[in-house]
Design a protein with these regions (language model features):
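Short loop/edge segments at beta-strand edges and connector loops
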Residues: 90, 179-181, 251-253
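Short alpha-helix immediately C-terminal to the canonical SAM-binding loop
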Residues: 159-161, 231, 235
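SAM/dcSAM-binding transferase cores
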Residues: 2-20, 26, 30, 236-291
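Conserved SAM/SAH cofactor-binding pocket of Class I
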Residues: 104-203, 210
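N-terminal auxiliary segments of SAM/dcSAM-dependent transferases
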Residues: 2-94, 98
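Conserved beta-strand signature within the Rossmann-like core of class I S-adenosyl-L-methionine
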Residues: 220-233
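A short glycine-rich, Lys/Arg-flanked "PGG" loop and its adjoining helix->strand segment in the class I
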Residues: 207-223
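Conserved hydrophobic residues forming the short capping helix/wall of the S-adenosyl-L-methionine
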Residues: 81, 166-167, 239-242
Length: 291
C-alpha cells in the first residue's frame, strides 16, 4: 500500500487533529517519479524503483468542498468501523496518513501514464476500483477528480451498504457502487473492457490482480496496482499473467518517503490487446491457481 502523512499549509484550518509539529510534517513529505519500461516487452533485470519527485501533501491541493467531503467520509468510516471490519485503523490522523494520502498518491502515476501512453487527456476517465473494500482508493479518487466516472466494485454486501451511505453523505454524483466479483463481471458485456483505468489496493498479489482487473480495462487503457516498496519479484512472477490478459508492464512508479512506512510502488500496466474470452476464470480459481 501507498501510505503518506498529510500536510496542511499555514493559512488553512485542518479538519483533523495532527499530533505532530510542522517540522515533522515537512520531514515526512513524499516524492514520486516514474520508471519507464518498454511498452511491448518487459525486461525483468530492469525492474528498478529508485525514484524521487513530488514534494507536498495531496490533501492540501483539494478545494474546501473536497476537504469537507474527505472529512465526512473519514468520520463515517470510523463510525461504521465500530460495527463492522472496514479498517484496522482507529484514529483520524492514522486514517489520513495510511488511507487518504495513500489513495491520493495514486493520482500522479495515473495522470502521467495516461497522458503519455493512452493518447488522450485525463478528463472523463472511466475508472473501476476492484475490491474497493471501504472505498479505498476509489471513493477518495472520485472526490479528488469529480470529472471522472468511478465504479466501486465490492463483493461483500455489508461493505456495499457502507459505500452507498458514504456516497450519499458526501454528495458524490460520479460514483457507482456495484456488488459482485471481478471474475463474473469480467464476462459481463456491461463491464468487460469498458474502463479506461482499473486500480487495486491491498487486494491480492499481482498474478491474481492481473486476472481480476485487466479483463475490465479497454484496449489502450491502464491497470494500476498499489504495492509495497520492493515489488520486483512479484512483478516478475506476474509477467506471464499480465501478458495472457493482453497487457504489458509499462512502468513502476515509486514514492520515496522518510516516514516509518518507507517507499511504496504503483505498478502500471498498459492493455495492448483484447483479453482472451476464457479469462477471467471461474470465481475463486485465480486466487487458488494463479497464472
Amino acid at each position: 500500500m501507498l501510505m503518506w502523512l498529510c500536510k496542511a499549509p499555514p493559512n488553512v484550518q485542518f479538519q483533523f487533529p495532527l499530533p505532530f509539529s510542522a517540522r515533522t510534517l515537512i520531514k515526512h513529505l513524499p516524492s514520486w517519479k516514474p520508471n519507464p519500461f518498454s511498452r511491448h516487452r518487459t525486461n525483468s533485470k530492469a525492474l528498478t524503483t529508485t525514484t524521487r519527485i513530488v514534494n507536498s501533501s495531496h490533501f492540501e491541493t483539494l478545494d474546501s468542498r473536497q476537504q469537507e467531503q474527505i472529512r465526512l467520509y473519514v468520520d463515517a468510516l470510523l463510525q461504521w468501523n465500530q460495527k463492522m471490519n472496514l479498517t484496522a485503523v482507529k484514529e483520524v490522523n492514522e486514517v489520513m496518513e495510511r488511507h487518504i494520502e495513500d489513495s491520493l498518491t495514486i493520482l500522479a502515476p495515473i495522470h502521467k501514464s495516461y497522458t503519455s501512453h493512452c493518447n488522450t487527456s485525463c478528463d472523463k476517465i472511466r475508472l473501476v476500483d476492484v475490491g474497493t473494500g471501504a472505498g479505498l482508493p476509489g471513493l477518495v479518487l472520485a472526490i479528488a477528480r469529480p470529472e471522472w466516472n468511478v465504479t466501486l466494485l465490492e463483493s461483500m454486501n455489508k461493505r456495499c451498504v457502507f459505500l452507498e451511505h458514504a456516497v450519499s453523505l458526501t454528495g458524490l454524483s460520479n460514483v457507482k457502487v456495484v456488488r459482485g466479483r471481478a471474475e463474473n463481471l469480467g464476462h459481463n458485456l456491461g463491464f468487460r473492457e469498458q474502463f479506461d483505468v482499473a486500480v487495486a489496493r491491498a487486494v491480492a498479489e499481482m498474478r491474481i490482480l492481473a486476472e481480476y482487473c485487466l479483463p475490465l480495462v479497454r484496449v489502450g487503457g491502464l491497470f494500476v496496482a498499489a504495492k509495497g516498496h520492493d515489488p520486483q519479484e512479484e512483478v516478475r512472477n506476474a509477467e506471464r499473467a499480465v501478458q495472457l490478459m493482453g497487457a504489458s508492464l509499462l512502468q513502476l512508479c515509486s514514492v520515496e518517503s522518510q516516514s516509518p512506512y518507507g517507499k511504496r510502488t504503483a505498478i502500471v500496466c498498459l492493455k495492448d490487446h483484447p483479453t482472451p474470452k476464457k479469462y477471467p476464470r471461474d470465481p475463486g480459481t485465480p486466487a487458488k491457481m494463479p497464472l
